[in-house]
């Protein structure tokens, strides 16, 4: 449990009694991303204390009869738990935009809910995770390793941000800014959608290992922007600029101006990486959007359709997600993994970090 920023402690909770409408998950694995470290460091505010973890895969331990029908799963089934909850009745939920559920909103999500709200088990850094009646639960394909299955979240993001929101079409030239796990997943999603050429950019030694593996995940070109001009590199490779640019960088203010420069006239720029409150965009001129007639879109969260597609793609084996540079640890080593992923330790950050309770 994260009691306060940078204070991750072990805490015992009583397992809840399960009724007709809810369930209990025995956690098999929980993936980590940049959001986890932002919570840990306090950069992303929240209602401390809480159990982090929002990329959970596990086995249904207990389930109510109504919940089993609603989710289509039973005791012993392996499932993935979506980040957001849905009341299934407000206008936003009925339109499929349950990220904006009137009952739950954006903050009332797994891995963010204060532990003072019973039963406290609202995240994947635990042996068990509570499944509320409004949870969104997805069956995991048989034979898919639970550690690999935690990629349902970043790959779902790659599909939604890099294809659905962007409107990526066969033959498109796609530039992905940021070679972290979501960047790799966006590259794979774009290639899977038929993109004709995919470039992925990174920055300096920290991203070196990530850039070395991007070609296994659909990228045709990897560019270290500390060494090479990505606009020049893309022009040399394709004869032009990108139809679609997907910016999944985090805390990289200059990336937005670079994204605008990489987009062709009338192209699309999808911004999914957050910059933090008050961040500027060095080198960016709004006039560039006007003169190039760009379509600039924000992307937040993932939906069930993208999650299901992600699980199917993971199960297909078409991309070597099982071979990603990965570090898997128990609950007692979670803090060290968080520090490593943020570049705050002597160990190089893994592309994919996972906790297995």
Q: Which sequence ranges carry the predicted segments?
A:
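Glycine-rich cofactor phosphate-binding loops and adjacent beta1-alpha1 units
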Residues: 165-170, 199, 208, 212-293, ...
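Cysteine-cluster motifs in flexible loop/terminal segments that predominantly coordinate metals
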Residues: 33, 82-138
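C-terminal capping/lid region of NAD(P)-dependent oxidoreductase domains
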Residues: 200, 239, 243, 270-271, ...
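Glycine-rich beta-strand-centered segment in the early N-terminal region that forms part
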Residues: 15-30, 43-94, 99, 141-143
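Cytochrome P450 core scaffold surrounding the K-helix E-X-X-R motif
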Residues: 35-40
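Mid-domain Rossmann-like dinucleotide-binding core that forms the NAD(H)/NADP(H) cofactor-binding site
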Residues: 127, 136, 141-227
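Short Gly/Pro-enriched turn/cap motifs at secondary-structure boundaries
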Residues: 3, 14-15, 47-53, 116-122, ...
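Rossmann-fold dehydrogenase core element
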Residues: 268, 283-323
